[in-house]
Amino acid sequence: KPDTTQTTEFNGNVSTSNLDLGKLTGASSLGRISFAAKVKGNSDKNSNISAFTDATINQLDAYKYTYSNIKINGNLTKSTYIGSIFLDDPNCKLNFLGKLDFADKIPVFDFTALVPKIDFLKLHLNTIDSISQASFLFTAKFSGNNLYNSKGEIKIVNSSYKNQNGEFKLSDI
């Protein structure tokens, strides 16, 4: 019996080693990526996609730094991501859980990101200070894509920043 919805289902494993992501995307800030992923989902003739992925990124070069130990587990559509991202890199620890929704004209964000350690200097994200480290808990529940149409709440709690001048504990924002 023919498939009148023209839906394609997929279920399998995808992996790559040292794929030049920068060359593939034209983004000069990106380099090579190595990953393995289990993916299960479907797509239709209108390029709508719905997939569950469980991925481990062993290497991701970005801004002349090689990130390691990234795990992604969640549901992805053409315009949304609901799930978790766990980063256990020596210079950046991150636990992300939540939803990013770009389905409407105004995007919607609802997530928590715990960053117990980030070293901006070693990640090449700060080139001014000789020391640049932070830790914080970031929660967001808002919609918007600029300052004028944003509505909701963003909180930064238990945050600290350290540079060559000392360590600064920040009040909850």
Show where each model-derived region lies.
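Interface amphipathic segments
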Residues: K1-I173
